[in-house]
């Protein structure tokens, strides 16, 4: 699928690293190091603006290697870029470790995944259909 993109400051375009990759890594569009102290949250720009077709979204997701090795995640867990958003994509980075982490210019800090979405049309009813599970949740099926 073609998605229109504007690169800012010669930012490298994201690309799929393997034929089976679902996500494309995005890079920090910063001119100098950004140090994240433990527990710190900062918005890191990635230097891309996109025009996503209606009926789709792009999810911004943490990179598993950064999370495992350095405790770097995203404060909002997963970010959604809506099809009508035209601003620069940013990553809401959070340092969940007990050590400072330095984000370098051009470092791969998150990944983008394109998803098809549908909008909900609510149908108000008096009762919902029954299931074996019912309202059981929050640990209902095990630990």
Model-derived regions, located:
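DUTPase catalytic domain/fold
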Residues: 1-143
């Amino acid at each position: 699928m073609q998605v229109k993109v504007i690169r800012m400051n010669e930012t490298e375009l994201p690309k799929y690293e393997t034929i089976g990759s679902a996500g494309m890594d995005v890079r920090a569009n910063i001119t100098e190091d950004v140090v994240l102290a433990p527990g710190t949250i900062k918005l890191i720009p990635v230097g891309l603006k996109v025009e996503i077709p209606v009926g789709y979204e792009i999810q911004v997701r943490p990179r598993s290697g950064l999370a495992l090795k350095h405790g770097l995640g995203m404060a909002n867990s997963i970010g959604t870029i809506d099809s009508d958003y035209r601003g620069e994509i940013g990553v809401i980075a959070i340092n969940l470790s007990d050590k400072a982490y330095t984000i370098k210019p051009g470092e791969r800090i998150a990944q983008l995944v394109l998803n098809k979405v549908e909008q909900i049309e609510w149908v108000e009813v008096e009762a919902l259909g029954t299931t074996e599970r019912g309202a059981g949740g929050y640990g209902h099926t095990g630990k």
